[in-house]
Amino acid sequence: MGSSSPAQTSNWYELFTGNWLSRPIRAVLVGALALPFVIWPRNQPQNSNPRLLAFFVYLLHLASIPWLYLVTKLVPEPYLDEIFHIPQAQKYCQGRFLEWDDKITTPPGLYLVSLITPGVVQRNGYLDYACSVQNLRAFNVFALAVLAYLALQCRREIEARLYEARFSTRLSNTSQYAVHTAFNIAFFPLLFFFSGLYYTDVASTAAVLVAFLNHLKRIGRDQNSVLSDLVTISLGVFTLFFRQTNVFWVVVFMGGLEAVHAVKTLRPERVDQPVILTLSEQLKHYAWRCSLGDVHDPPLHAMWPDDMIFCVLSLGIAALCNPIRVIRQIWPYITTLLLFGSFVAWNGGVVLGDKSNHVATIHLPQMLYIWPFFAFFSLPLLIPYALPLANALRRLLYMKTSSWSISSSSNKSLSRKSSSKVSNSKGDVAVDAPGSEYPQPSKELQYFEVVFGSKIFLWPLYLLGTIIFSFGIVHYNTIIHPFTLADNRHYMFYVFRYTIRRAAWIRFALVIPYTVARWMTWGTMAGCSQWFMTMHGPACSAYSKGDGKSPFLNHPAFTNRGASPQQTDAAPPAEVKDLDANQQQELSQALKKDPLLASVEPATTSTGLIFLLATTLSLMTAPLVEPRYFIIPWVMWRLLVPAWKFHDHDSEGVAATLERHPKTKPLLLFLQRYDLRLILETFWFIVINAVTGYIFLTKPYVWKAEDGTVLDGGRLQRFMW
């Protein structure tokens, strides 16, 4: 074995000592790494996983610092969009705030926050400042560490809000799932890659997470102070300084969720459903209950196509009937929207600088492309979809049963259920049984119950409708931006080249992968979903909590025929109360026994629909398909994904097999206490980051014309996202 050369030894010394960065920047990076421990609440419960937090903090340090070092050494000059961002930031460093490069179309938030970071600005004279390329890039490493901490706090608050909505008790625990999820978000290939370059994406995402964290704290209270409202406006405007499309995430997503929160805090008294015989009276009763705040908003794992319709309808009625309460909650977001509108009017358009190449165009295929994007990067999260297939293969191999028996038993079970009742999203809608003492409802009401209560009827129609709509989008609205065709430095160039540009029929054939990817990503956000019909049964975490019904169920197809006078026996969430010492001790013991106890709760239907609306609005006006545009939608989706235990979706399959063998039983116990997908997701991201980083750093090339003439002055080109 040969020894390392002095030059190699020097390089490694520079890497780990940080001498290649200015002293203030080194101090900032160390401060960023220490940030979680400095801000970490001192009164955290014992099961708040500080060791796991420390492990991921230093894992992020060991990944991001060498990445920045390698980029600085091998790509010392500004590359691609950096040739616009870095000179503009350097102008700001010199105090030339009125000079602007018209080729830059995004606001100056990145340049402004870079100025207030110690070490980025180095004083060379009385009023002369200079920002070096490496120090400006180092700011994004700092921003990535801040983003990881914000993601941790956001996931913690999401779990707390969902737990409080179910049990009306305050949750102060920081779960292992929240810690690992946050740092997987920081390792997300697009965020990690651009943390080594001076791009706006990392800082913009962190800014949105600041506003999102503030929003999550606001919905933890019934009422908010004027100071909280002013802070919300300030944070909303702050996000707009990084990217204009952030307005959709602040105003539509967060504002929409707060409008739903305002309606749900009405807390109407629970009443029995009267015996109603006509459709008109049934709809009147439904509208009256909605106006009081008795809305229909089941958890995502229990959502069916009709639930989406009645969720929107019930929330709309409740908001229209309680406008003052809703406006009092969302006026900060309305103000943010008005301020943004004033800027657009003053600027003469949404984008800054050159508007010719950034003309807003309706581009709905973006909402088809995003699902394969999610599915590819979150491939390990789709493991639950493989277990039913694995079980079917296992049964086939051992000749115990066939895969057809699963389908037939499921159909028989559903037939028996539908013959006696029509199930709604979280309750059972009783239909007249023979010999019932109740009078017969009208034919219109019976038809209404069958159409909107039968999931077997609605689900195929919904699936067929989405497929037809997708074909229409592909046929009438496929747009290929000139930048996509002209720039072979981006991976998207090759994706388009070998898929939708290869042949017209491929565009239409891809509708099936789009649909499957959408189904899987929505099912992942739903947790243990009913799309698996009876294959999960009571083993699903979301069903094994005892009181499995949501308090927000008001389906108009529910009628009282004597079986049950109410759709749900769950009480509406009361004001959240702090636990006393004994209750806190009991909760801590429960969380110690089951670390995923508070992490398996899925978001509500309204949250999923508002997320879909915000994603659509933020993408549909962009003619250019750019993976960086999908970063914030992915981050928000990833934060909403609940935890998964290995036995979920798998009551009688692989998990049961592992439990029967003494050698594999400890492994099963671990997988029921820790989400296996997180570990696989970490390794998946490491592989993607290693491959794309290696290609970017070591596979440069020179642009040449068809006749061999060197283009772009012979500058090296590199592959990137």
Swiss-Prot record:
It comes from the Eukaryota. Residues 406-437 are annotated as: Disordered. One of its GO terms (molecular function) is dolichyl pyrophosphate Glc2Man9GlcNAc2 alpha-1,2-glucosyltransferase activity. This is Dol-P-Glc:Glc(2)Man(9)GlcNAc(2)-PP-Dol alpha-1,2-glucosyltransferase. Coiled coil: none annotated. It comes from Gibberella zeae (strain ATCC MYA-4620 / CBS 123657 / FGSC 9075 / NRRL 31084 / PH-1). Glycans are attached at N173, N411. Its main location: endoplasmic reticulum. The keyword Transport does not apply.
